[in-house]
């Protein structure tokens, strides 16, 4: 109905309005995606990229008319995950080359668990590597 009303108002054919405006701007839902992450460990000279799955996408948010003390927003986060182990190459003797990283199995929109997730507005990218930053003495 809305495309017809807009078409009538704007004098255009309904065929140029194939989707309702809200559907046209629909964002991807919270879901598993493949992501390259950089693994690194103190004492090892290089980062190593690995492919894993992470949770990414949008969750329904709310902005209540009457402000309450405890307003929270749902974020796209892990429902289930497991961990994989990887051995970094080129680590010197005496440094354990083993690192463990999470692999998302399923996702959901829920409260952010600050002890296991990065809930900041703009966090470091998954492929960020501290070894790539020059250190000046």
Curated annotation (Swiss-Prot):
Q: Which cysteines are joined by disulfide bonds?
A: 30-76, 44-91, 47-129, 55-107, 59-109, 112-119
Name the major location: secreted
Q: Which GO terms describe its cellular component?
A: cytoplasm; extracellular space
- Which is a Pfam family this sequence falls into? Cys_knot
Location of the protein in the cell: Secreted
Q: Which controlled-vocabulary keywords does the entry list?
A: Disulfide bond, Glycoprotein, Hormone, Secreted, Signal
User: What exactly does this protein do?
Assistant: Involved in gametogenesis and steroidogenesis.
* Protein name as catalogued: Gonadotropin subunit beta-2
Q: Which gene encodes it?
A: cgbb
């Amino acid at each position: 109905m809305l495309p017809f009303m807009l078409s009538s108002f704007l004098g255009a054919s309904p065929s140029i309005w194939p989707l309702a405006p809200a559907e046209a701007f629909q964002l991807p839902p919270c879901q598993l995606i493949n992501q390259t992450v950089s693994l690194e460990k103190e004492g090892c000279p290089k980062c190593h990229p690995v492919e894993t799955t992470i949770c990414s996408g949008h969750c329904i948010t709310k902005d209540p008319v009457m402000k309450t003390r405890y307003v929270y927003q749902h974020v796209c986060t892990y429902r289930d995950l497991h961990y994989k182990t990887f051995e970094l190459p080129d680590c010197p003797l005496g440094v354990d080359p083993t690192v463990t990283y999470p692999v998302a199995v399923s996702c959901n929109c829920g409260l952010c668990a600050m002890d296991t997730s990065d809930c900041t507005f703009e966090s470091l990218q998954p492929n960020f590597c501290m070894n790539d930053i020059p250190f000046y003495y």
